[in-house]
């Protein structure tokens, strides 16, 4: 059998608790757990772990750099722009139309909202920057939403997501019992 140890990285002695551990099963979500930080710490400690490596985790959490990488290898991605307090709000709406505004390095749709005017874009920016230093406005793409998990070199079957919300937000992901998966 296996001996399992639960370790909370919020505790100051979490690294010391890992002494003698042969494998870490990472069950953390969001910044600090999915962004390469924990993966890097475990790698530094010489402890093998489950899931993606440091670089893959860091890129997956960073929407801006992921999109730049995809563009660099010729993959299609929705148009986007990094927002700052001095952004040309109306110019962005004129260029993209409706956009989704999101923290660049956050998950679970936290801090994410839509905007279809200069005023709502500015408000969405203020909301998103509460959760991350970098904020993106991404062009709205109309159509069904799918998710596909990749395990090793294999893509698992796609899942179509349906929600009564405007988009697959935090509520639809974790709270609502009305979200449908096909």
Spans of features found by a protein language model:
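ATP-binding N-terminal substructure of ATP-dependent carboxylate-amine bond-forming enzymes
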Residues: 1-55, 59-65, 72, 84-91
């Amino acid at each position: 059998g296996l001996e399992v140890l639960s370790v909370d990285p919020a505790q100051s002695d979490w690294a010391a608790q890992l002494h003698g551990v042969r494998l870490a099963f990472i069950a953390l979500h969001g910044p600090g757990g999915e962004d390469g930080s924990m993966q890097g710490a475990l790698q530094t400690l010489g402890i093998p772990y489950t899931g993606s490596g440091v670089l893959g985790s860091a890129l997956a959490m960073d929407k801006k750099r992921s999109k730049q990488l995809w563009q660099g290898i010729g993959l299609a991605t929705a148009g986007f722009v990094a927002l700052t307090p001095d952004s040309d709000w109306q110019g962005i709406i004129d260029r993209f139309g409706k956009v989704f505004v999101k923290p660049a390095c956050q998950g679970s749709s936290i801090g994410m909202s839509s905007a279809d005017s200069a005023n709502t874009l500015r408000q969405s920016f203020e909301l998103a920057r509460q959760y991350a230093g970098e904020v993106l406005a991404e062009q709205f793409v109309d159509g069904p939403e799918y998710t596909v998990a990749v395990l090793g070199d294999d893509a698992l079957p796609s899942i179509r997501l349906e929600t009564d919300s405007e988009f697959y937000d935090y509520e639809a992901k974790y709270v609502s019992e009305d979200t449908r998966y096909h």
